[in-house]
A protein has these predicted regions:
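Beta1/beta-strand and adjacent pyrophosphate-binding region of the FAD-binding site
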Residues: 3-16
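Long, compositionally biased intrinsically disordered regions
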Residues: 547-549
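N-terminal Rossmann-fold NAD(P) dinucleotide-binding loop
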Residues: 19
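Short edge beta-strand/loop segments characteristic of extracellular beta-sandwich folds
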Residues: 488-492
């Protein structure tokens, strides 16, 4: 077979959002970069093959913590050029992001099979990937590599130490862990999509799908009928395989999840309360590649823990942030009648240190994505794709500094070296939670902002919906001024009544938990609709940021 050797400064393995962001970031810093992907498309779990919606910090109430930098650029371009958000249009945006970079070469359909090591066995000198489309071996030689492949194929072949399964509670004192370690991971999912064909379309369950489901098979936690129409991501619980080896038994897991998915469609189509409504619907797409949540987690100089995420721990070498809660899935998936996800929300956004993004043993190997140095329960937060994209961007920037300075990843975690990485990340519109530092060349601190229009009472919409105050409510608002005298609310009252209120400041860590109370009071409200009432707060604001009513 034909063999081609490619010399690069930096090679990224894995074309999901983490690998794509790592490769593009490094290339934009002038680094000759290769992106090696074993699938025909980019995007990983967000690709047209799997179609999991990317989520991140803003889905958990951190309203001004949307992931910025490269992933924001990608999303804005997708909205501009793919306004209907079609899967194929999204695929084109992903590939265009890579192909538009002159310093980046994309190698699709190339599966890594071998790694070459130095004599000491602590450094990867090259990798070999096979492209079946052209019956060619591609050898990549580079001083630095990033394994963003999810399963960590390069790290595994190189002998980098890793973890799988759940740690014992005693190892890191994580409260959700069992007393003893367990091999269980979170399972894999297949998504499906149906369309209205405009005429009756029958569906017959294939004979090999020997699973006939009824309403009792879904239990109280899987509202299959409620999910079908409003939410394209509603079938994330079509999941299984966490009790198996999520690397070496992927084919077996995929077959069973496909069987479950077809059985669910058979129930929806033929026997569910939606059956009559779905008479004209046909299954027009089903994933052929399972979306993975968890497999290997490679050990770095620091293992990120659940407690550090929950406590918003400070790291001098912080390079990326996350905000998704602890989202743990039972290993039995669909066949386990427990709640398919135990989701514990966070106090606020948290950071990830650079020391968790490289191997502690292989000196030139970075990691980004779901294979980073984290515990099982920490990964249940960091594994979501917008967080992974942030990790990839951080690794790409760190790799560019490593190439230019000829330093290994470990040497970038302290002093001026890590501050330089952080500064360049901030200049690229990347976000690191609660990090404030001067950035050379940053024009934003001196910029002036003007507005073409101002929102006022007269321009308010007639209604944004009604939030009834029969129970307590918490309103989260940003306050930038040094004093707040009044706060106006628009209310409807079906009788004369009284409103009790308290006003709290927020914490300094970006959390959405109220802290010290600044004001309280009661105000009479007369019967009537569409009234603006003023709460006389009369308070000094100790610090700008989140406040709560």
């Amino acid at each position: 077979l034909k063999t081609i050797t490619h010399p690069y400064d930096f090679v990224v393995i894995g074309g999901g959002l983490s690998g794509l962001c790592a490769a593009v970031t490094a290339a934009r810093q002038g680094i000759r970069t290769a992106l090696v992907q074993d699938r025909p498309v980019l995007g990983g779990n967000a690709s047209t093959e799997i179609r999991v919606p990317p989520v991140g910090a803003t889905q958990c109430n951190f309203g001004f913590s949307r992931e910025t930098g490269l992933i924001e650029e990608l999303f804005l371009n997708n909205l501009l050029r793919n306004p209907t958000c079609s899967p194929e249009g999204w695929n084109l945006e992903l590939e265009s992001l890579a192909r538009n970079e002159p310093n980046l070469e994309l190698f699709l359909n190339c599966a890594v099979c071998k790694v070459a090591m130095n004599d000491a066995g602590d450094r990867v000198t090259g990798i070999t990937a096979y492209c079946s489309m052209e019956e060619t071996w591609h050898e990549f030689v580079a001083p630095y590599l990033a394994d963003c492949s999810g399963d960590g194929v390069v790290g595994s072949l190189a002998g980098a130490p890793f973890r799988m399964g759940v740690e014992a509670r005693s190892e890191f004192n994580e409260p959700m862990c069992p007393d003893e370690p367990a091999p269980d991971t979170m399972g894999m999912s297949l998504h499906m999509h149906a369309r209205d064909a405009g005429r009756p379309v029958p569906f017959t369950r294939p004979p090999w799908v020997d699973l006939e489901l009824g309403p009792d098979d879904f239990g109280p936690y899987r509202p299959v009928c409620e999910h079908f129409f409003p939410d394209t991501g509603g079938f994330w619980w079509l999941e299984w395989g966490g009790a198996l080896d999520t690397v070496h038994e992927t084919r077996k897991i995929k077959d069973e999840v496909q069987r479950i998915t077809l059985a669910v469609w058979d129930y929806l189509k033929n026997r569910s309360p939606l059956a009559e409504r779905l008479t004209t619907y046909e299954l027009d797409w089903m994933g052929a590649v399972p979306g993975k949540r968890e497999s290997r987690r490679f050990e770095g100089d620091h293992v990120l823990t659940m407690n550090e995420i929950d406590e918003q721990a400070h790291f001098e070498d912080a390079v990326a942030f996350g905000g998704w809660g602890f989202d743990h899935h039972p290993p039995g998936g669909f066949h386990d009648k427990l709640n398919p996800s135990t989701h514990q929300y966070l106090r606020g956004p948290h950071n990830v240190p650079l020391r968790s993004l490289y191997s502690r043993r292989i000196s030139n190997l970075f990691f980004a994505g779901r294979n980073i140095s984290a515990t099982h329960y920490a990964l249940s937060s960091t594994r979501v794709m917008l967080t992974c994209a942030q990790l990839g961007e951080a690794v790409g920037m760190a790799a560019s500094h490593a190439v230019k300075s000829q330093l290994d990843p470990r040497a970038l975690t302290e002093g001026s070296a890590v501050r330089s990485v952080q500064s360049d990340l901030l200049l690229a519109d990347h976000h690191i939670h609660a990090l404030e530092m001067p950035v050379i060349g940053d024009l934003a601190p001196r910029a002036k902002v003007t507005a073409s229009s101002v929102f006022s009472e007269s321009t308010a919409a007639e209604s944004w919906g009604i939030d009834r105050l029969s129970d307590d409510r918490l309103l989260q608002i940003p306050v930038a001024s040094e004093r707040l005298d009044t706060l106006s609310l628009r209310v409807d009252a079906d009788r004369d009544t009284e409103l009790t209120y308290r006003f709290h400041q927020g914490p300094t860590n970006g959390s959405t938990f109220p802290e010290d109370q600044l004001a309280e009071g009661r105000i009479r409200i007369s019967k009537g609709s569409d009234q603006w009432i003023e709460l006389p707060l009369q308070v000094d604001i100790p610090r700008p940021g989140w406040h709560f009513l």
